[in-house]
C-alpha cells in the first residue's frame, strides 16, 4: 500500500490565522481524514483526549503556554508524530533540546512548499511508527498464544498424566493434523 492510500488525522495548534489558512489548503486532500485546528495548549489537550492524532503541528508560542510541554507529552506518551514551528532565531536551541524526544522542528517564517515537504516527512515518520505498532501487536499475539499453550500443557500434564514433552507433541500434532494454530488447540483443551 503506497503512502497515497494511507490516511492521517492531524491536529494543528496555532494562534496564527496565516498558518491556519496555509495548513487548511495543504490538508484539504483526501489523505487527511480528520483535521482539527485549535489555538491554545488547553484546547489541544482536550482535542487529544477525544482522539489521538497521527500528526500534530504546534506553532509556538501559543497564548496560554509555549507549547513545549505539549510537544513532549504527545511525542512520548502517544503515537503522534509532532512538529514544532519555532522562530528562526530559536531553531538551533529548540532542535537541540527537543530532537531527543523525536520532535521535528522547523523554523518560521516558512513557506507553503516547506510546510508541504514537512508534512511528507511527518507522514513517513508516522508510517514507520505504524509498522512498529503492528510488530508489537504481532509479538503480543505470539506471547498470548505461548501462554495458552503452556496452560493447556499444564492441564494435560495434571489431568491426563502426560509428560511435558508428550503434552507439547500432542498439541503440535493436533494443530498440524487439523491445519490450525497451537493456540486454537490450546483453547479447545482449556475449554473442555
Q: Model-derived features: where do they sit?
A:
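Conserved phosphotransfer microenvironments
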Residues: 20, 44, 54-75, 89
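C-terminal output/effector regions of signal-responsive regulators
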Residues: 137-192
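Conserved acidic segment of CheY-like receiver
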Residues: 6-18, 23-27, 56
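The C-terminal output helix
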Residues: 120-134
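Short hydrophobic/Thr-rich beta-strand motif most characteristic of the beta2 strand and flanking loop
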Residues: 33-40
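C-terminal output helix
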Residues: 110-119
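A short, hydrophobic beta-strand element within the central beta-sheet of small alpha/beta folds
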Residues: 79-89
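Alpha4 helix (beta4-alpha4-beta5 surface) of REC/receiver domains from two-component response regulators
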Residues: 69, 88-104
